Amino acid sequence: MSAITEIYAREVLDSRGNPTVEAEVYTQDGGFGRGIVPSGASTGEHEAVELRDGDKDRYMGKGVTKAVANVNDIIAKEIVGYEVTDQVAIDKAMIALDGTPNKGKLGANAILAVSIAVARAAADELQVPLYNYIGGFNAHVLPTPMMNVINGGAHSDNKVDFQEFMIMPVGAPTVKEAIRMGSETFHHLQKLLAADGKVTSVGDEGGFAPDFANNEEPLEYLIKAIEAAGYKPGKDIAIAVDVASSELWDNDSKKYKLRWSTGEEFTTEEFIKYLEGLVAKYPIISIEDPIDENNWDDWVTITSELGKKVQLVGDDFFVTNTEYLRKGIKMGAANSILIKVNQIGTLTETMEAIEMAKEAGYTAIVSHRSGETEDTTIADLVVATNAGQIKTGSMSRTDRLAKYNQLMRIEDQLTDLVAKYKGINSFYNLSEQARQDIINK
């Protein structure tokens, strides 16, 4: 193998037109890799630090020239000379160079851009696909997609409290067919909304964000769209929601408030019953962040009450951090973790979180951010780790479709003999009976 000879970073733009960090890595024998970092809109308070300039006269304070300079002036000097395939050592060297628990000195956006670029340069030098380089010959599971077709909460300007309403083609035989089913349902949803005079412009993640009367109306539209596309709700396409409850939690009153819709308030016990009612009524298979990120005991409560029926995903709760995940596993909080590479800041730490989850029987869902780029690393990562589920937006916007297109390419490369799409069985954190209940709902 050959050594890294050059690392260079620049400021580019994400899908929202905000600056982000792009890094390039070059090797002695001609290997080349590029990594671009995404950015979130609703972020967990314990996430690794995304370093921004804060200069209000430039990009309204969102510039990343400091992070870029940290790559070019500090990280490059440390990492040039490393063997490009020594990913773990390189990631650990950058973590040590930063020296803070949250990567606040150099910026997780600076470190992650280099981490991704290094992996891509190594794959390029070895002339193998990225998923193959990261996961070896065992990489073969194509993920069940979570397609965010209706946006609410912090991701929109409407009167819907839940942040995301998603469809999951759990009955598809392949990822290609899953994407087709999702696309058809998306277009039927658009027709249904338009016929009712609702706005069909799309939000950050490619989903629709019209006004609805309450949080159940989007679910009713999803059922209608699934049926209009010729599929059976539950059996063919299940529903997932991201409550993003930290946005609803009021720490003073200790209640959840439907702040975007009715203004109704719930105690934790009442809010759990509210969610339980939705699960009983609709073919919901997954709920993300149903409880505020700092209320650990309440997470244990909802897991004991709902965790055998549906997937309970920790996003802001775990922030892709093995320390928080380890605590959650020990306490019995949640049964799934959302994996966002920029929440933790290196590929090595990301993969450690995925493996820890799988060993504990938790599912790991590899996820995009609301501010995305053309970088398709997460599509390769989800296959490399056989994680089984991916969350990467709706059926519109090139930054989202780039990941779906990459998954279809990977499925072709693996061929039908090797590639495996598990659909409903990707929910190995739920019992066979629970999965059947979703299918039969």
From Swiss-Prot:
Q: Which residues form a coiled coil?
A: none
Q: Catalytic activity annotated for this protein?
A: (2R)-2-phosphoglycerate = phosphoenolpyruvate + H2O
Q: Which domain of life is it from?
A: Bacteria
Q: How is the cofactor bound?
A: Binds a second Mg(2+) ion via substrate during catalysis.
The record's section on PROSITE patterns has: ENOLASE
> Under the cellular component aspect of Gene Ontology, which terms does the record hold?
cell surface; extracellular region; phosphopyruvate hydratase complex
Cofactor field: Mg(2+)
Pathway per its UniProt entry is:
Carbohydrate degradation; glycolysis; pyruvate from D-glyceraldehyde 3-phosphate: step 4/5
The active site annotation covers 205 (proton donor), 340 (proton acceptor)
Q: Which GO terms describe its molecular function?
A: magnesium ion binding; phosphopyruvate hydratase activity
Q: State the Gene Ontology BP annotations.
A: glycolytic process
Question: Which NCBIfam families did the record assign?
Answer: eno
Name of the molecule in the record:
Enolase
Recorded source organism is Ligilactobacillus salivarius (strain UCC118)
Report the gene name.
eno
